[in-house]
Protein backbone atom coordinates (compact mmCIF):
# COMPACT_ATOMS: atom_id res chain seq x y z
CA UNK A 1 0.00 0.00 0.00
CA UNK A 2 1.35 3.45 -0.90
CA UNK A 3 2.44 5.58 2.03
CA UNK A 4 0.22 8.60 2.65
CA UNK A 5 2.08 11.91 2.73
CA UNK A 6 1.85 13.76 6.02
CA UNK A 7 -0.18 16.94 6.01
CA UNK A 8 2.08 19.99 5.96
CA UNK A 9 -0.18 22.48 7.66
CA UNK A 10 0.24 24.82 10.59
CA UNK A 11 -2.06 27.03 12.63
CA UNK A 12 -1.27 29.71 15.20
CA UNK A 13 -3.41 31.95 17.39
CA UNK A 14 -1.62 34.84 19.04
CA UNK A 15 -3.16 37.39 21.38
CA UNK A 16 -1.44 40.33 23.09
CA UNK A 17 -2.59 43.65 24.49
CA UNK A 18 -1.92 45.10 21.02
CA UNK A 19 -3.16 42.47 18.55
CA UNK A 20 -5.27 39.34 18.17
CA UNK A 21 -4.18 37.19 15.25
CA UNK A 22 -5.02 33.76 13.84
CA UNK A 23 -3.12 32.20 10.94
CA UNK A 24 -3.45 28.87 9.12
CA UNK A 25 -1.17 27.74 6.29
CA UNK A 26 -0.98 24.74 3.97
CA UNK A 27 2.41 24.37 2.29
CA UNK A 28 0.96 22.01 -0.33
CA UNK A 29 -1.86 24.31 -1.36
CA UNK A 30 -2.68 26.18 -4.53
CA UNK A 31 -2.26 29.75 -3.32
CA UNK A 32 -5.78 30.28 -2.02
CA UNK A 33 -6.06 33.03 0.57
CA UNK A 34 -8.54 34.60 2.93
CA UNK A 35 -6.90 37.64 4.48
CA UNK A 36 -8.15 40.44 6.69
CA UNK A 37 -5.76 42.64 8.66
CA UNK A 38 -7.52 46.00 8.47
CA UNK A 39 -4.57 47.37 6.47
CA UNK A 40 -5.49 47.41 2.78
CA UNK A 41 -2.02 47.59 1.25
CA UNK A 42 -0.74 44.89 3.61
CA UNK A 43 -3.65 42.61 2.67
CA UNK A 44 -2.69 43.10 -0.98
CA UNK A 45 0.93 42.12 -0.25
CA UNK A 46 -0.07 39.05 1.78
CA UNK A 47 -2.33 37.94 -1.06
CA UNK A 48 0.72 38.11 -3.36
CA UNK A 49 2.73 36.09 -0.83
CA UNK A 50 0.10 33.35 -0.78
CA UNK A 51 -0.67 33.38 -4.51
CA UNK A 52 2.93 33.12 -5.70
CA UNK A 53 4.20 30.71 -3.05
CA UNK A 54 1.18 28.42 -3.61
CA UNK A 55 0.85 28.33 0.19
CA UNK A 56 -2.80 28.49 1.18
CA UNK A 57 -3.22 31.14 3.89
CA UNK A 58 -6.05 32.18 6.15
CA UNK A 59 -5.14 35.29 8.16
CA UNK A 60 -7.35 37.24 10.55
CA UNK A 61 -5.67 40.13 12.35
CA UNK A 62 -7.17 42.71 14.66
CA UNK A 63 -4.81 45.34 16.02
CA UNK A 64 -4.47 48.79 17.52
CA UNK A 65 -4.74 50.56 14.17
CA UNK A 66 -5.86 53.72 15.95
CA UNK A 67 -2.17 54.04 16.93
CA UNK A 68 -0.55 52.90 13.67
CA UNK A 69 -0.02 49.77 11.55
CA UNK A 70 3.24 48.66 13.17
CA UNK A 71 1.97 46.13 15.71
CA UNK A 72 -0.46 44.56 13.25
CA UNK A 73 2.17 44.12 10.53
CA UNK A 74 4.92 42.84 12.83
CA UNK A 75 2.69 40.48 14.81
CA UNK A 76 1.15 39.09 11.63
CA UNK A 77 4.68 38.33 10.42
CA UNK A 78 5.38 36.56 13.70
CA UNK A 79 2.26 34.41 13.41
CA UNK A 80 2.81 33.53 9.74
CA UNK A 81 6.40 32.56 10.51
CA UNK A 82 5.34 30.35 13.41
CA UNK A 83 2.65 28.68 11.28
CA UNK A 84 5.13 27.98 8.46
CA UNK A 85 7.61 26.53 10.96
CA UNK A 86 4.91 24.22 12.33
CA UNK A 87 3.96 23.14 8.83
CA UNK A 88 7.59 22.35 7.96
CA UNK A 89 7.93 20.07 10.99
CA UNK A 90 11.40 18.50 11.12
CA UNK A 91 11.98 19.70 7.54
CA UNK A 92 12.73 16.25 6.18
CA UNK A 93 12.69 15.97 2.41
CA UNK A 94 12.48 19.67 1.63
CA UNK A 95 14.48 21.31 -1.15
CA UNK A 96 15.67 23.81 1.51
CA UNK A 97 17.46 26.38 -0.69
CA UNK A 98 16.05 28.66 -3.38
CA UNK A 99 16.64 32.06 -4.94
CA UNK A 100 15.06 34.16 -7.66
CA UNK A 101 15.47 37.49 -9.43
CA UNK A 102 11.95 38.78 -9.97
CA UNK A 103 11.03 41.55 -12.41
CA UNK A 104 8.00 43.82 -12.33
CA UNK A 105 7.98 46.61 -14.89
CA UNK A 106 10.99 48.83 -14.06
CA UNK A 107 11.83 47.00 -10.83
CA UNK A 108 14.06 43.97 -10.16
CA UNK A 109 14.39 42.32 -6.74
CA UNK A 110 16.27 39.21 -5.60
CA UNK A 111 15.21 36.91 -2.78
CA UNK A 112 17.24 33.97 -1.48
CA UNK A 113 16.12 31.61 1.27
CA UNK A 114 17.61 28.81 3.31
CA UNK A 115 15.10 26.93 5.47
CA UNK A 116 17.96 26.24 7.83
CA UNK A 117 16.33 26.62 11.24
CA UNK A 118 18.70 29.56 11.75
CA UNK A 119 16.78 32.85 11.56
CA UNK A 120 18.51 35.75 9.85
CA UNK A 121 17.47 38.62 7.60
CA UNK A 122 19.74 40.48 5.21
CA UNK A 123 17.83 43.51 3.90
CA UNK A 124 19.18 45.67 1.10
CA UNK A 125 16.11 47.58 -0.03
CA UNK A 126 15.67 51.35 -0.11
CA UNK A 127 12.44 53.26 -0.64
CA UNK A 128 12.41 56.82 -1.96
CA UNK A 129 9.42 57.86 0.18
CA UNK A 130 8.29 57.06 3.73
CA UNK A 131 4.81 55.95 2.67
CA UNK A 132 2.94 54.03 -0.02
CA UNK A 133 -0.46 55.65 0.32
CA UNK A 134 -0.95 55.51 4.09
CA UNK A 135 1.34 52.49 4.60
CA UNK A 136 4.77 53.09 6.17
CA UNK A 137 7.43 51.66 3.87
CA UNK A 138 9.67 50.79 6.84
CA UNK A 139 7.08 48.18 7.82
CA UNK A 140 8.02 46.02 4.83
CA UNK A 141 11.32 45.25 6.52
CA UNK A 142 9.62 44.77 9.90
CA UNK A 143 7.34 42.14 8.38
CA UNK A 144 10.15 40.13 6.81
CA UNK A 145 12.26 40.38 9.98
CA UNK A 146 9.38 38.89 11.99
CA UNK A 147 8.70 36.24 9.34
CA UNK A 148 12.33 35.08 9.12
CA UNK A 149 12.83 35.07 12.89
CA UNK A 150 9.77 32.97 13.59
CA UNK A 151 9.87 30.65 10.59
CA UNK A 152 13.50 29.82 11.35
CA UNK A 153 14.77 30.80 7.92
CA UNK A 154 17.72 32.71 6.55
CA UNK A 155 16.32 35.31 4.17
CA UNK A 156 18.18 37.72 1.90
CA UNK A 157 16.26 40.41 0.00
CA UNK A 158 18.05 42.73 -2.43
CA UNK A 159 16.37 45.33 -4.61
CA UNK A 160 18.58 45.75 -7.66
CA UNK A 161 16.71 48.80 -8.97
CA UNK A 162 13.28 50.36 -9.26
CA UNK A 163 11.54 53.73 -9.32
CA UNK A 164 8.03 52.99 -8.06
CA UNK A 165 7.81 52.24 -4.34
CA UNK A 166 4.69 50.10 -4.75
CA UNK A 167 6.56 47.98 -7.28
CA UNK A 168 9.59 47.70 -5.01
CA UNK A 169 7.47 46.46 -2.10
CA UNK A 170 5.47 44.12 -4.31
CA UNK A 171 8.56 42.53 -5.85
CA UNK A 172 9.90 41.88 -2.35
CA UNK A 173 6.77 39.90 -1.47
CA UNK A 174 6.56 38.13 -4.82
CA UNK A 175 10.25 37.20 -4.88
CA UNK A 176 10.11 35.81 -1.34
CA UNK A 177 6.96 33.92 -2.29
CA UNK A 178 8.55 32.29 -5.33
CA UNK A 179 11.66 31.37 -3.34
CA UNK A 180 9.54 29.84 -0.57
CA UNK A 181 7.54 27.91 -3.17
CA UNK A 182 10.69 26.13 -4.34
CA UNK A 183 12.45 25.78 -0.99
CA UNK A 184 9.44 24.22 0.77
CA UNK A 185 8.79 21.69 -1.99
CA UNK A 186 9.55 18.04 -1.29
CA UNK A 187 12.55 16.82 -3.30
CA UNK A 188 11.65 13.29 -4.49
CA UNK A 189 15.31 12.26 -4.19
CA UNK A 190 15.47 13.50 -0.61
CA UNK A 191 12.26 12.01 0.82
CA UNK A 192 12.62 11.12 4.50
CA UNK A 193 16.05 12.70 4.80
CA UNK A 194 17.02 15.96 6.45
CA UNK A 195 18.87 18.07 3.86
CA UNK A 196 21.84 18.74 6.14
CA UNK A 197 25.03 16.86 7.03
CA UNK A 198 24.24 17.73 10.67
CA UNK A 199 21.16 15.53 10.52
CA UNK A 200 18.83 18.23 11.81
CA UNK A 201 17.44 21.62 10.80
CA UNK A 202 15.54 22.37 14.01
Curated annotation (Swiss-Prot):
Which reaction is this enzyme known to catalyze? D-erythro-1-(imidazol-4-yl)glycerol 3-phosphate = 3-(imidazol-4-yl)-2-oxopropyl phosphate + H2O
Q: A GO molecular function for this record?
A: imidazoleglycerol-phosphate dehydratase activity
* Extent of the signal sequence: none
Pathway named in the protein's UniProt entry: Amino-acid biosynthesis; L-histidine biosynthesis; L-histidine from 5-phospho-alpha-D-ribose 1-diphosphate: step 6/9
- Location of the protein in the cell: Cytoplasm
CDD domains associated with the record: IGPD
Under which name does UniProt file this protein? Imidazoleglycerol-phosphate dehydratase
